[in-house]
């Protein structure tokens, strides 16, 4: 019996088998969790239904996190099958493509700034607000961040600011929901080749650099992140809340390892 047996967890953000959310769902399924999934639009519906079926789930619901009404409708529908559940994984982030290339100050726009923060950060607390009364004591909410929240990463630009907002969101949500027995955490994952990452200029160079200088001398995988996510949504991590856990092979703690390559 896995360490998530008896847990019901909603997973957002599965777009392909390369998605971090897919790796998380795989690990949670392996550990016995009962899963539900969301999809953003009809283009993704069939694909997400297929992945859900492979992971033993028939609960696949539409949700556009840009619209509060869509979030509310999704949780109302989920409540018909799961009146109570044990948490959700927020693996959602977006910025317009023109924001992710070149000099940050030149590239950023008011609209791009607003959209990045709305979709990548506000949507996390919007989902928590909408399902707060449905969460069992001992529930865990998890989101995905990146080192660009802490450091200026070339071409990551306004997404770095949105991820910094998201990490602050984690702390404030953890403090607000803790008395109800709800924990809130984030994983700051190392770069992984996903559909979302493909929109960042020179992402392949970023991967190669990380592989060369990361202490473990490899990039992390969706399986690495999935295993950590399963732990953070389980009772094994009952004392952890408000944290940003780096699953990046140690990249964020090292400096100047490139000197050893010369």
UniProtKB/Swiss-Prot annotation:
It holds the Pfam family adh_short_C2. Pathway: Lipid metabolism; fatty acid biosynthesis; Cofactor biosynthesis; biotin biosynthesis. The active site is at residues 146, 156. It is an enzyme of class 1 (oxidoreductase). The record marks 201, 204-205 as: Involved in acyl-ACP binding. Keywords: Antibiotic resistance, Biotin biosynthesis, Fatty acid biosynthesis, Fatty acid metabolism, Lipid biosynthesis, Lipid metabolism, NAD, Oxidoreductase. GO terms for biological process: biotin biosynthetic process; fatty acid elongation; response to antibiotic. InterPro entries: Enoyl-ACP_Rdtase_NADH (IPR014358), NAD(P)-bd_dom_sf (IPR036291), SDR_fam (IPR002347). One of its GO terms (molecular function) is identical protein binding. It catalyses: a 2,3-saturated acyl-[ACP] + NAD(+) = a (2E)-enoyl-[ACP] + NADH + H(+). The keyword Lipid biosynthesis applies. Changing residue 93 to S: Diazaborine resistance. Homotetramer. This is Enoyl-[acyl-carrier-protein] reductase [NADH] FabI. The gene is fabI.
């Amino acid at each position: 019996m896995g360490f998530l047996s008896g847990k019901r967890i909603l997973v957002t953000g599965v777009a392909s088998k390369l998605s971090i959310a897919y790796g998380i769902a795989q690990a949670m399924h392996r550990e016995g969790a009962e899963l539900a999934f969301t999809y953003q639009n009809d283009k993704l519906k069939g694909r997400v239904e297929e992945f859900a079926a492979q992971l033993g789930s028939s609960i696949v619901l539409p949700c556009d996190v840009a619209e509060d009404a869509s979030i509310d409708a999704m949780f109302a529908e989920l409540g018909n099958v799961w009146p109570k559940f044990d948490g959700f994984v927020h693996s959602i982030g977006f910025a317009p493509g023109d924001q992710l290339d070149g000099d940050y100050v030149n590239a950023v726009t008011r609209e791009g700034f607003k959209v990045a923060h709305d979709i990548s950060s506000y949507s996390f607390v919007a989902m928590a607000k909408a399902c707060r009364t449905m969460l069992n004591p001992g529930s865990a909410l998890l989101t995905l961040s990146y080192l660009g929240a802490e450091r200026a990463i070339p071409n990551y630009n306004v997404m770095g600011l949105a991820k910094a907002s998201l990490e602050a969101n984690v702390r404030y949500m953890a403090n607000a929901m803790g008395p109800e027995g709800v924990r809130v955490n984030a994983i700051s994952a190392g770069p992984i080749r996903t559909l979302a990452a493909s929109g960042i200029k020179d992402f392949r160079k970023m991967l190669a650099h990380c592989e060369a200088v990361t202490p473990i001398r490899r990039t992390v995988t969706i399986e690495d992140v999935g295993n950590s996510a399963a732990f953070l949504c389980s009772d094994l991590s009952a004392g952890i809340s408000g944290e940003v856990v780096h699953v990046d092979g140690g990249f964020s703690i090292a400096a100047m390892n490139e000197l050893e390559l010369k």
